[in-house]
């Protein structure tokens, strides 16, 4: 079975979000599972520099200009690169300029990505062609459409990492992207009078996956589907929509081997976690005290992530004696709010605006509770890292958060399945009730340690996801 992942970023070469983490880990897990998985990426500068053994496979003149297809390797995974400097050789973000304006030629930049993905199934590399083209998010959404236009030389899977990003472009660009105008249709890639790369992937793929079972159900409901619920409900009825939970890359996220921690530990040596907490308290300007629970946030600061709820609930958390360490950036209003809280509550609130991968490991190793109060969360990786590190996740019941964290209710504690704290409603009162439950459990150290061990024993490895995808690919053949 030969599978080509078509996507726009890959950790650690280039990362703007969780998609990169998936592509950085899933193909390698699939190779270990017996699938010949390769990755197709635009040759953005950081990616091009990282694939040091790239060789020319093919040269083509396309609707988007001249391109060179390269092939090399990264961490044992075969990587195809679309080398088109006039489209991809730009500093900074792959999607927008330094003023945060989307590049005006994004329609060509990402149509080309989908086109090359489909051409790979038609022999662009004469020595290797995929049985399945697996496209990820809107950037690769046209790959299934190009395959459909070519008579489907390979099966296609389209994975939705976040339905909120749709890749919308003016209709007249149909003239530029080498797809038939008949595809510009409600039964096709048209959405609200525009081209939707996301809808193209959803409509033309042989199968759609979402990054968790709960999110796969949620996106058939109007409040989560952004107007595409009709198509997604139809795909669900046809058995062509399913959820496959993301995994954790244990080579990077494991407290037993994590060199970024002050003190490494396992579920059997949890007492060694304490030094990480002490170092984190020092680094964040918090009072060094192992008797108080340290809550943490590692997140984009947006209302989608529920960080306004944390700000609203913060006085209640602090009144009970807790501390907060926050690492993130985003909405300027939220940034100012958390910085003001740090100034108002010195020693109890520590805030670092920005994102530093290394420091996120130190927070995960040092905190007692990781807050993930998202309004919606397709899968979420932060709570999985928390489980892995014995840093109990406090989450809202939505998307992948609902699939991965079990509340510390009396029943779940008795059944040995409790792994964190879960609240239902997206408001500060509901969040505060969950925080209160965390304090109650904290007051019972042996029970807290029991739940930590339960959490750390859970298996969210990429091998589980790789097996699920392999079974799906073979069903499509």
Swiss-Prot record:
Protein name in the entry: Glycogen synthase
Keyword Glycosyltransferase carried by entry: yes
Binding site residues for ADP-alpha-D-glucose: 15
Reactions performed catalytically: [(1->4)-alpha-D-glucosyl](n) + ADP-alpha-D-glucose = [(1->4)-alpha-D-glucosyl](n+1) + ADP + H(+)
Organism for this UniProt entry: Escherichia coli (strain UTI89 / UPEC)
Superkingdom of source: Bacteria
Family: Belongs to the glycosyltransferase 1 family. Bacterial/plant glycogen synthase subfamily.
First-level EC class: transferase
């Amino acid at each position: 079975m030969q599978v080509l992942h078509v996507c726009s970023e890959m950790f650690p070469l280039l990362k703007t979000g969780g998609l990169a983490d998936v592509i950085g880990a899933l193909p390698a897990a699939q190779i270990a599972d017996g699938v010949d998985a390769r990755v197709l990426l635009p040759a953005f500068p950081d990616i091009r520099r990282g694939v040091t053994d790239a060789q020319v496979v093919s040269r083509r003149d396309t609707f988007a200009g001249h391109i060179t297809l390269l092939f090399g390797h990264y961490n044992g995974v075969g990587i195809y690169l679309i080398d088109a400097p006039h489209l991809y050789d730009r500093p900074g973000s792959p999607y927008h300029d330094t003023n945060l304006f989307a590049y005006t030629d994004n329609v060509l930049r990402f149509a080309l990505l989908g086109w090359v993905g489909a051409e790979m199934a038609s022999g662009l590399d004469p020595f290797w062609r995929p049985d399945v083209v697996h496209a990820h998010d809107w950037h690769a959404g046209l790959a299934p459409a190009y395959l459909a236009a070519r008579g489907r030389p390979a099966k296609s899977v389209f994975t939705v990492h976040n339905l909120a990003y749709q890749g919308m472009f003016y209709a007249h660009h149909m003239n530029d992207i080498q797809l038939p105008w008949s595809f510009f249709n409600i039964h096709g890639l048209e959405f609200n009078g525009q081209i939707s790369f996301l809808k193209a992937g959803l409509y033309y793929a042989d199968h759609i996956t979402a990054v968790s079972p709960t999110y796969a159900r949620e996106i058939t409901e109007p409040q989560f589907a952004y107007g595409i619920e009709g198509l997604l409900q139809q795909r669900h009825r046809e058995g062509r929509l399913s959820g496959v939970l993301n995994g954790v890359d244990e080579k990077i996220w494991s407290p037993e081997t994590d060199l970024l921690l002050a003190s490494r530990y396992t579920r059997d040596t949890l007492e060694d976690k304490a030094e990480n907490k002490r170092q984190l308290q020092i680094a964040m300007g918090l009072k060094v005290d192992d008797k108080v629970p340290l809550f943490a946030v590692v997140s984009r600061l947006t209302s989608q992530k529920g960080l306004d709820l944390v700000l609203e609930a913060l006085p209640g958390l602090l009144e009970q004696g807790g501390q907060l360490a926050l690492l993130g950036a985003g909405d300027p209003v939220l940034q100012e709010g958390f910085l003001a809280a740090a100034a108002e509550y010195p020693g109890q609130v520590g805030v670092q605006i920005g994102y530093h991968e290394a420091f996120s490991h130190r927070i995960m190793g040092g905190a007692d509770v990781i807050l993930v109060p998202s309004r919606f969360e397709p899968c979420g990786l932060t709570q999985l890292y928390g489980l892995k590190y014995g840093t109990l996740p406090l989450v809202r019941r939505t998307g992948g958060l609902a699939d991965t964290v079990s509340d510390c209710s009396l029943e779940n504690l008795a059944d040995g399945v409790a792994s964190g704290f879960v609240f239902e409603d997206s408001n500060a009162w509901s969040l505060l009730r969950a925080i209160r439950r965390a304090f109650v459990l904290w007051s019972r150290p042996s029970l807290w340690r029991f739940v930590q061990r339960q959490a750390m024993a859970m298996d969210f490895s990429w091998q589980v996801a790789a097996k699920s995808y392999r079974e799906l690919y073979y069903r499509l053949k």
